[in-house]
Amino acid sequence: MLPIGLDTDVNASAIGEATYGVTKGLDSSIYITVGTGIGVGVILDGKAVHGMQHPEAGHILLSRHPEDTYAGRCPYHGNAWRDSHRDRLIERAFLEERQGTSCGFRAMGIESYYLAQALVDFTLTYSPKRIVLGGGVMHQKQLFAMIREKYKKMLNHYVDTPYVRDLDNYIVPYSLNDDQGIMGCIRIGLDEMKR
């Protein structure tokens, strides 16, 4: 019988980055996918976190951006991070920016506010040595500078380690030609075959 390994898509991405990518060699890291939704994979002591279930970090509650009036769609948490991210304003604004209008910059400001806030929370709770941002939205590379700037302001030097002092190497884009999920699945399969 052929062994089968199972995990979530975002954990596979976190494992892929930790095995072959930008977090290889680090014992702790976080991979966040920002696309049609929000997913978070956490690596601690070199392994994906599994407690009573996988992390559902897309449902963490964040302080609402002052310009965000969207009530959210989540039936459980009106201001869940995933709903703040999925606001139609943001979706529309990214489209408008690609078409050459200036509305997208405002939407990126809102998006980077929520991302920075979540990253501060994850820094304080998981103490990762690197945070990787992937998914379709993160193909907008200009978001990284905005996220880092807001993150630094929100963290306000509360954590002062060499990792967070070098934000360009702490909050980083995905690697592996955006194939980190497939690469993670390979690692999961290889590990399962060894059991």
Positions of PLM-derived features:
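ATP-binding/phosphotransfer module of carbohydrate and carboxylate kinases, centering on a glycine-rich
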Residues: 2, 16-27, 48, 64-195
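Short glycine-aspartate micro-motif
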Residues: 5, 29-33, 39
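Active-site glycine-centered loops adjacent to acidic/histidine catalytic or metal-binding residues
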Residues: 9, 35, 185
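A short acidic/small-residue loop/turn micro-motif
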Residues: 55-58
